[in-house]
Design a protein with these regions (language model features):
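Bacterial Sec-dependent N-terminal signal peptides
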Residues: 1-16
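Generic marker of residues within folded, mature protein domains
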Residues: 1-3, 33, 72, 117
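C-terminal/domain-edge helix-coil "capping" segments
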Residues: 12-21, 133-263
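N-terminal segment of the mature soluble domain
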Residues: 12-92, 251-261
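Beta-strand elements of well-folded, non-transmembrane domains
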Residues: 28-30, 47-49, 86-88, 121-133, ...
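Generic structural hydrophobic/aromatic packing signal, biased to beta-strands
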Residues: 41-43, 82, 127, 225, ...
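A short, hydrophobic beta-strand-centered structural micro-motif
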Residues: 66-117, 122-127
Length: 263
């Protein structure tokens, strides 16, 4: 609201103004309201028997972050339980890419064919959130088998090498694909829970107009009110306490309330 007052001066009376650019940092409030005393969370991950050996080196629970909350190993105010499904190949095929060379006249003088393997695969993951009393809070789908994904192998000049690539390197490729899928799922979950329940750090860039003419009768008072705003508001960060801020801003608020009646 304070930022509207300088604009009111401009709209109703010709005034020399300076554009003052600033950045402010703050924490956004949760979109979904739950018990305001809840401030800790823990994460549990369960995989299938097929995927468990590959998940051991990934520690997906460490990737889940709820901004503004404290993470515990167990017994948090809310518990996030994640179920990771299998990474399943659904189709394998060999594709080719043909490269032609031409002479100066544009006549094709040669061709070279490169072969690569494409593997269509799917992945599924879900999360369920409850509080420590056992009350259900929300479910979230993190990955769906409806979304087909495609892995493309390196290219080879010999077709047989492309045809056997996934079979020979299935463990390495599957682990890398699973890692990518898990990372995306945990990132999606972190974004969703931070939006819904977190206190996210936000940086906003904006500007306001301040009186530039020393001849203006409000110059000194306006600048003083602006200095108060600058010291209190623009110096705050997401971890700052707002205790006492309203009292410190009261002189500036009173001033702007007064001048909007005059201009």
């Amino acid at each position: 609201m304070l930022l509207l007052f300088p604009l009111a001066l401009t709209a109703q009376k010709s005034v020399d103004l300076d554009k003052y650019r600033f950045s402010v940092q703050y924490r956004s409030l949760p979109k979904i309201r739950i018990d305001s005393t809840y401030r800790t969370y823990n994460v549990e991950v369960e995989g299938t028997k097929l995927m468990e050996p590959l998940l051991k080196d990934m520690s997906p629970e460490k990737l889940v972050m709820l901004e503004g909350w404290r993470k515990l190993a167990e017994d948090g105010h809310i518990s996030i339980k994640i179920n990771l499904g299998d990474l399943l190949p659904e189709g394998v095929s060999v594709k080719e890419r043909v490269v032609t060379t031409k002479n100066r006249d544009g006549v094709i003088t040669g061709t070279k064919t490169y072969y690569y393997q494409e593997v269509v695969y799917t992945f599924s993951a879900n999360a369920s959130i409850t509080d420590y009393k056992g009350m259900h809070i929300m479910d979230e789908e993190l990955a769906s088998r409806v979304n087909k994904q495609v892995y493309r192998s390196p290219e080879f000049t010999i077709r047989a090498l492309a045809e056997g690539y996934f079979v020979v390197n299935s463990l390495t490729v599957t682990k890398q694909l699973l890692q990518n899928c898990v990372n995306r799922a945990m990132h999606h979950l972190s974004e969703r829970i931070s939006d819904n329940f977190g206190f996210r750090e936000v940086t906003a860039n904006d500007y306001m107009w301040i009186i530039d003419s020393r001849k203006h009768p409000e110059y000194a008072a306006y600048r003083q009110a602006f200095r108060v705003m600058n010291e209190v508001l623009f110096s705050m960060n997401p971890s700052s306490s707002i205790e006492g801020a309203k009292e410190q801003l009261k002189p500036a608020i009173d001033y702007f309330e007064k001048i909007k009646k005059n201009y």
